[in-house]
From Swiss-Prot:
A biological process from GO: translation
Keyword presence, rRNA-binding: no
The protein's name in its UniProt record: Large ribosomal subunit protein uL30
Keyword terms of this UniProt record: Ribonucleoprotein, Ribosomal protein
Provenance organism: Bartonella tribocorum (strain CIP 105476 / IBS 506)
Highest taxon of the lineage: Bacteria
A GO molecular function held by the record: structural constituent of ribosome
Amino acid sequence: MVQKKSQSGKTVTVEQIGSPIRNSQIQRATLKGLGLNKMRRRRVLEDTLCVRGMIARVRHLVRVIDED
């Protein structure tokens, strides 16, 4: 599967601040898709609409630290 690179090259840093315990399976899968599975983990991701949608879905469990 070929992934397209973002045109602008912008990135977003996301940190997990909440536990997925007592949350739905979809929210757990979304965290896993973002590369987060333990508290205080940080990931630098491409700033795309898909990533923004995933962040919005679990906005109560993550914090956006930096947007470049």
